[in-house]
């Protein structure tokens, strides 16, 4: 067993079963590199694409995109383990290795679930950690589930009086958009898995003849699909951070500018543009008027509270001629070296190690259970 010391022991959990597995690994590598070793004793736990948990060495260099190759957790990455859903075990990570089955490999104080997408960012691991009685960074079960599902995010935002874009939800068994809906949405539309991120499975449709293929592509990742009206406007983002005393703050605003990439002219911020090439320009701070920035920060905090979020979130907006429109809420935003969330906080005067420490401290202060 890894011996205890006076530092807070943090289990950074990454990988997972979703199609965002690789991005989770890259985010974890960045976090492992920036957690303050004087304050935190870090344990790295990878989850394979089929859901097995392994204790890894946590070397950040193994969790990077190298020459276009995406990182992945495998059974060979470390020792198989489990986290018992028993609060009496006090965060024990138990070996599943035949040679040492049941041995306690480590006992952790808090979990940092750097998981993107289903089976991680959607309330599932948060539920496990609640059962296990282990504090964790980020949103609770309800907010994680609501933030992951674009349909229910929009429902909660609308109920709070926040502006959202027009959309149609296609549940399993429905494979088209009616003529009335097409007239209402207009073109282009964006077809997305309802519970996904990193633009995986997302298509831009500029002709209704392209819709069936776009729905099929989205359904490779989620049986529920959302068709969103294209919104003409600037893409802005704002980070939200909760502190241990319950105070909630919003970051400097960032902007994503995408021209035609790889010979395309659609300016679509897709997976490759985000992570594999230089097709996007990220402006932090965004070049917007002070009153616009202030309004977006206020809306970001309102959106954070509308889904009962905790810990942190990144709120994405379109800035249109009629004002800001809330696009999405990410309850566990990316933490790669190019991710907007840490960059926006750095521009706000909060460096990366301080940002991560605030998240861990907030998780410990919050604890588990009803709150």
Curated annotation (Swiss-Prot):
EC numbers, comma separated? 6.3.2.4
For whether the record's keyword set contains Nucleotide-binding, the answer is: yes
Read off the Pfam families from this record.
Dala_Dala_lig_C, Dala_Dala_lig_N
Q: Where in the cell?
A: Cytoplasm
The record's listing under InterPro entries reads:
ATP-grasp, ATP_grasp_subdomain_1, D-Ala_lig_Van_CS, D_ala_D_ala, Dala_Dala_lig_C, Dala_Dala_lig_N, PreATP-grasp_dom_sf
Q: Give me the reactions it catalyses.
A: 2 D-alanine + ATP = D-alanyl-D-alanine + ADP + phosphate + H(+)
Q: What does the record list as coiled-coil region(s)?
A: none
Q: Which cofactor does it need?
A: Mg(2+); Mn(2+)
Q: Which one GO biological process term can you cite for this protein?
A: cell wall organization
Residues that coordinate or bind Mg(2+) 1: 316, 328
What is this protein's function per UniProt? Cell wall formation.
Similarity section = Belongs to the D-alanine--D-alanine ligase family.
Protein name, UniProt field:
D-alanine--D-alanine ligase
């Amino acid at each position: 067993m890894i011996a205890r010391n006076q530092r807070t022991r943090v289990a950074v959990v990454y990988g997972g079963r979703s199609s965002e597995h690789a991005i989770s690994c890259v985010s974890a590598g960045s976090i492992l590199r920036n957690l303050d070793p004087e304050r935190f004793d870090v344990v790295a736990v990878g989850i394979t694409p089929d859901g097995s948990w392994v204790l890894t060495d946590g070397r950040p260099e193994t969790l990077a995109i190298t020459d276009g190759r995406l990182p992945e957790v495998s059974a060979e990455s470390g020792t198989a383990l489990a986290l018992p859903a028993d609060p009496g075990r006090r965060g024990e990570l138990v070996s599943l290795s035949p040679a040492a089955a049941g041995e306690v490999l480590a006992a952790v104080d808090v979990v940092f679930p750097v998981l993107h997408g289903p089976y991680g960012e959607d309330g599932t691991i948060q539920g496990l950690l609640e059962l296990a009685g282990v504090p964790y960074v980020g949103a609770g079960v309800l907010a994680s589930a609501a933030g992951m599902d674009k349909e229910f995010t929009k429902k909660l935002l609308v109920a709070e009086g926040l502006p959202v874009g027009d959309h149609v939800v296609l549940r399993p068994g429905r494979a088209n958009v009616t003529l009335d809906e097409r007239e209402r949405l207009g073109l282009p539309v964006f077809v997305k898995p309802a519970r996904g991120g990193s633009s995986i499975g997302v298509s831009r449709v500029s002709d209704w003849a392209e819709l069936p293929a776009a729905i099929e592509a989205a359904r490779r990742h989620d049986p529920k699909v959302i068709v969103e009206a294209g919104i003409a406007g600037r893409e802005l983002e704002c980070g939200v951070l909760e502190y241990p005393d319950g105070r909630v703050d919003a970051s400097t605003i960032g902007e994503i500018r995408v021209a035609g990439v790889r010979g395309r002219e659609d300016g679509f911020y897709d997976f490759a543009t985000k992570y594999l090439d230089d097709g996007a320009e990220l402006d932090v701070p965004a070049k917007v008027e002070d009153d616009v920035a202030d309004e977006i920060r206020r809306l970001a905090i309102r959106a954070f509270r509308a889904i009962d979020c905790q810990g942190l979130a990144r709120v994405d907006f379109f800035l249109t001629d009629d004002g800001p429109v809330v696009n999405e809420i990410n309850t566990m935003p990316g933490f790669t070296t190019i991710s907007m969330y840490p960059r926006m906080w750095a521009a706000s005067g909060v460096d990366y190690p301080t940002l991560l420490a605030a998240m861990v401290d907030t998780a410990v202060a919050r604890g588990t259970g009803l709150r």
